[in-house]
């Protein structure tokens, strides 16, 4: 019996890697085939049909109301229209929640490193308290102990004559739907793009000037802001933007909870920067704010972004807890449709595909950002 030669392809490292990946792929395919075959057999045994055609069937209306609907919807619409409402509601929470959580997390993270004893201790108490209590419990607190305890709409709390707060939600000023508003928005978008471009070119004065002229001024005077107003006929509040108590609860809960984890990520990233960088920047006469903005934070970003991506993904997945407080996101509406139609498998596939798509988009975006801020070794 002869031993295999060392130069055999079995000992080729490239072949071993490819062979291992092929084996793993085959195993995954076999697992999917096994469960798919079981699904088909069970559907046939129970004489059930599989398909998504019912979502678009106009003869089968959704027949249920959706309280928080940002787009036009009625119970006579199709199930697909109801799903679209849930999708928009989920996007509202995800986008605004990620933006607010990152902003609050950075502030709290910097507070954890503050030289002020009181600020540092308050930030520490916030992080340790929020991180060590369940998110669902926090949502119940915000909903049942805060928003539902607010006054009725007739006795709304009023702030500066422009903001109203009651147990049905929050009412805020909002731009009117007019040509002037859309023109101002277009100018603001161009101003933001120009400011980002100038900041990348290290032209700070031009960047601040473009922000002032093309963003701040149109924001204050260009947009036709409409403030909420109490209707004396029916005691309702008209105009402005209405954020329901369910939406506000979920947004606050997700923001506060996720920001606690982001704060620790930011703190760890900043502390990973060599202490000599601080001392060198201070020796050049830079103020602490400039040291953080120009020297420390850019070096901390490559450390911060990977775990920050995980926290953004967790926020997206945690948003499915909306069903616990009655907010109609994609998961809540899918559950209602599954109960009415018996299409539980199809709706589960829709929900899984939706969250998978959102998470893949976030992952790809954050990976691109991570490549941009990566420190290039010479």
Where are these regions (language model features)?
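Transmembrane alpha-helices and adjacent helix-loop boundaries
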Residues: 1-378
